[in-house]
């Protein structure tokens, strides 16, 4: 079975401190979230965590876009 990285590991590849883009800002902020579920892959669990704990995420649409990119990358 192929290795599947966690969503957090994928998200960290999107970090860019010089970018104002939504995905980069999400990644930059998640990096400093000490309670982010770093090993999680499940969309529902991640979504619930972010809805309850991530004041730094202005819209869940940003998470949806990031998770879609994650799923696409994990298919290859």
From Swiss-Prot:
It comes from Lactobacillus delbrueckii subsp. bulgaricus (strain ATCC 11842 / DSM 20081 / BCRC 10696 / JCM 1002 / NBRC 13953 / NCIMB 11778 / NCTC 12712 / WDCM 00102 / Lb 14). This is UPF0346 protein Ldb1277. Pfam families: YozE_SAM_like. Belongs to the UPF0346 family. The lineage of its organism: Bacteria, Bacillati, Bacillota, Bacilli, Lactobacillales.
